[in-house]
Amino acid sequence: MTTAKRLAMRLKFLMKSIIPMTLAATWLAGCATPPPPRLAIWDAAELGRIEIVRQHLAAGTDVNAGGGITGLSALHQAAFHGHTAIAGLLIAAGADVNATSRRGETPLHSTVYWERREIAALLIANGAAVNAKLENGQTPLDWAVQLGAADMAEFFRSQGGESAD
């Protein structure tokens, strides 16, 4: 067998097997969307698991999806539990700063319980309605007054917050 024939046979083998497999593997690795993690995005936000939140964002998880019986979003959970970096990441990914739970609670309402002023400021800076109302008409300022969170009440007033009364 001549050298030219051997070379032609090797080239034919490469064209039929190795090259298509290599191209397919490269295409699949570069184009595939990773699956979402098993831990729900709102649970990851509640627990402060920023890497899992990032994995959800890479997988295309809906950042505004509400979870459980309350319908709280991942941003609600991050706000309530004081995870500022996660709140910022979610906002940058398009989370609705005025999303409402089943009873009308916004992420801004969620900041009141534990006096998460830094997150409240982040939400307001990104368009959160400072006078958003629950289904019973309470604003974040009303909650702050009711819970005795004087610093939060003062902060909301400084941002234009009003009482529903």
Task: Enumerate the language-model features and the residues they cover.
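Start-of-repeat signature of ankyrin repeats
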Residues: 37, 70-71, 104, 137
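Conserved ankyrin/ankyrin-like repeat signature
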Residues: 52, 85-86, 118-119, 151-152
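Ankyrin repeat boundary/linker residues
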Residues: 67-68, 101, 134
